[in-house]
Amino acid sequence: MLFRKRKPKSDDEVITFDELTRFPMTFYKTIGEDLYSDRDPNVIRRYLLRFYLVLGFLNFNAYVVGEIAYFIVHIMSTTTLLEATAVAPCIGFSFMADFKQFGLTVNRKRLVRLLDDLKEIFPLDLEAQRKYNVSFYRKHMNRVMTLFTILCMTYTSSFSFYPAIKSTIKYYLMGSEIFERNYGFHILFPYDAETDLTVYWFSYWGLAHCAYVAGVSYVCVDLLLIATITQLTMHFNFIANDLEAYEGGDHTDEENIKYLHNLVVYHARALDLSEEVNNIFSFLILWNFIAASLVICFAGFQITASNVEDIVLYFIFFSASLVQVFVVCYYGDEMISSSSRIGHSAFNQNWLPCSTKYKRILQFIIARSQKPASIRPPTFPPISFNTFMKVISMSYQFFALLRTTYYG
């Protein structure tokens, strides 16, 4: 089985690095994406996965073209503006999924190198993992990943399967004379996609697979971001805790200087890795926030102007988009706060009995921590909770403009 139910590990068992990235890696493979495909000795499996991925995205983008065509046709008139705005958030979601997959493909080798570097500094034995509190970070990360994934995939699943479930219940259980052949997304097909039952189901399941591909590619890039930031946060917090607890008076000056030298090297490497995370993900997050602002706006507009059935569907969509932005901002804020802690810990440790040279090195550590590790999308401030409020503000401005246009 792809997702086997695993027995939860106790705090007395060693956690491997691969366990922290297994969920996004395995989930990604369900659409054919394997980050480590170049290391797969099975050439046939490698090319089959690649073919499945390309085929899935060709199918996905063919339906996106149909959505765009539907939007263009209906945006021309105020009488069909509601129908146009109904498909707009789906188009925005699709563009985000496409752009994230494109960004991952471009930065694949850099991302693999980043994961390899994180694996090199990952604590391996049980005693070290207890000091790093690896078990806590793994549990917290898995909870966030699970809830985030369920919410986002609920959106795509509800839009995909609701029309078929509704039609089936009405036809077989409620005695409806016809089986309504509707689709979960508004699409302008270049052929008659409803008259012939075979064509309808072929198109319907093609659309369902398209939604699944979009959902997985949309979610998994964020899951990889969560996995990398979680580990960097773990390293920064370990440095801060270890630095604050260090008693310089119990060691010789030579031992103190050696300790600080090793810690500075370790800190510098963690900062370099955080900068690489910024280089890989910052532009993706910029587009993500811009598109999310529009998606939240259009989904919110549909909630205020649609019938009860659509309100439920778009509320799920609205919630998933909000949570996605919040999760990214939360982990960006965690990176900033954990790396900033190092300076406070350096100041709070018992440095009074130490030498002048030791104190001078501490000053450099404190000065470096004034510029914390962060993710900095172009034109945006470093990602934090303040960024979340900025995205919400942008969404509301678009929403107010749209309501003014629609209601006059």
UniProtKB/Swiss-Prot annotation:
Its main location: membrane. Keywords: Cell membrane, Membrane, Olfaction, Receptor, Sensory transduction, Transducer, Transmembrane, Transmembrane helix. GO terms for molecular function: ionotropic olfactory receptor activity; odorant binding; olfactory receptor activity. The atypical heteromeric and topological design of the odorant receptors appears to be an insect-specific solution for odor recognition, making the OR/Orco complex an attractive target for the development of highly selective insect repellents to disrupt olfactory-mediated host-seeking behaviors of insect disease vectors. Odor-evoked OR currents are independent of known G-protein-coupled second messenger pathways. Pfam families: 7tm_6. The lineage of its organism: Eukaryota, Metazoa, Ecdysozoa, Arthropoda, Hexapoda. The keyword Membrane applies. The keyword Cell membrane applies. It is found in: Cell membrane. Residues 1-52, 96-144, 231-276, 332-378 are cytoplasmic. Interacts with Orco. Complexes exist early in the endomembrane system in olfactory sensory neurons (OSNs), coupling these complexes to the conserved ciliary trafficking pathway. Odorant receptor which mediates acceptance or avoidance behavior, depending on its substrates. The odorant receptor repertoire encodes a large collection of odor stimuli that vary widely in identity, intensity, and duration. May form a complex with Orco to form odorant-sensing units, providing sensitive and prolonged odorant signaling and calcium permeability. One of its GO terms (biological process) is signal transduction. This is Putative odorant receptor 92a. It comes from Drosophila melanogaster (Fruit fly). It is a multi-pass membrane protein. Belongs to the insect chemoreceptor superfamily. Heteromeric odorant receptor channel (TC 1.A.69) family. Or49a subfamily. The chain crosses the membrane at residues 53-73, 75-95, 145-165, 210-230, 277-301, 311-331, 379-399. Residues 74, 166-209, 302-310, 400-408 are extracellular.
